[in-house]
Amino acid sequence: FSTIEQLIEIKTDLWKAIKSFSNKNSGKIEPTYIVNLGNSLKQQFRIAEAIECYDLVNKFNLDIPQSWINRSETLIMLNQVSNTFSIQMLEQIKRGYENVLLSKQVPPIWLDHYKEQIVFHKSKISEACRDAGIEPNPLDSEKTKDEYDKLSSYRKFCLENNLSLSEHGLYCQCMGSSRDNLTIPTAGGIVGDFVIPMEMVLNRLKSEFSFSRHLYFEYLTTEKDYELLHDSCFSELFNDELLGIDVEKLRTAFRLCFGILDKIGIAICELFDLYPPNGNVYFQSFWQLDRDNRRELFDSNKSPGLIALYSIATDLNEKKDGELSFLKQLRNDLEHEFVVVYKSESPSDIYDSYKFMDNIVFIKEDEFLEHLRRILQLLLHQ
């Protein structure tokens, strides 16, 4: 935590650069900016988001070897942080280095190093297969596709949108990522006193996240119940506001996400005895690293997870110039203001129904959906 603020500033500048480039170029993205953002997130142990950045760039099939190199390094980091691995993880690490060798942008002096990495991970794959009593399968990617095709539409949705509570699902869409099997890691199989209470916390977080995620899925995939809407007898005001159970699914899902964040903050305070002086825990602001000796207290725990969580909190904190602080503001508006979700380009208001109040917040449906997807992914990455 002694140097985290410098990394936060770099991350914030990269977010701004990506946004500025997109605004000036009709929504396009600059791949090298995305790779640099991924590298910054990797340094802050935001592994899932870093992999997402590299995957996005690699889909363009451009000659950007840094993306493949750092994706492989991030998978190695995932192995080290989670103390778990799979043959598929080793395969993808190796494949990343193989793609690097195809690049024309790699200095010749580095080629031997990447060749050594390929040989090393080939041997690890052979060793893992031998320990598991299986033969290496050159058709493994086809098997993965077959397994994916057999998944439910809901589970496919979770994997396609990076919303699966599975470490395996970060890099593979096989049957092994078909369940939300995230657990509290216990290095070396040693179960400490904290593990059972933290599993209880994780159960609560998974339950609320799963509910929020399913509300999002239902809104996108379930046909609107017009009979139920009719039975609600809403007054027709011709003001384009979306009403009824369907849109309330979005509102509820969004609010739930911030409740989950605050519960994560409480769990951190309980686990590491890090409650702020006033005892109030709001995820984006309870850290208060510059008060008393709290930075040293956080630093003494040597936890990559804490660094990742603090980094995410700064994204949501307006006082830290957080790129996603508008999400927290939207949550506050949903709780305390009249928020109108509308579908058209701009809401009409024939009868001037919105003039009664000055502080009505308007948000277009597709923007709200994108914000909900973003906060759900942010939760997953914790």
Describe each region flagged by the PLM:
Residues 3, 7, 11-30, 58-64, ...:
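Flexible helix-coil transition and linker loops at the boundaries of alpha-helical arrays
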Residues 10, 50, 86-89, 93:
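Single-residue signature of alpha-solenoid repeat helices
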Residues 78, 86-91, 98-207, 241-247, ...:
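Acidic, Ser/Thr/Gly/Pro-rich intrinsically disordered interaction regions
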Residues 202-220, 239-272:
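Short, hydrophobic, well-ordered secondary-structure elements
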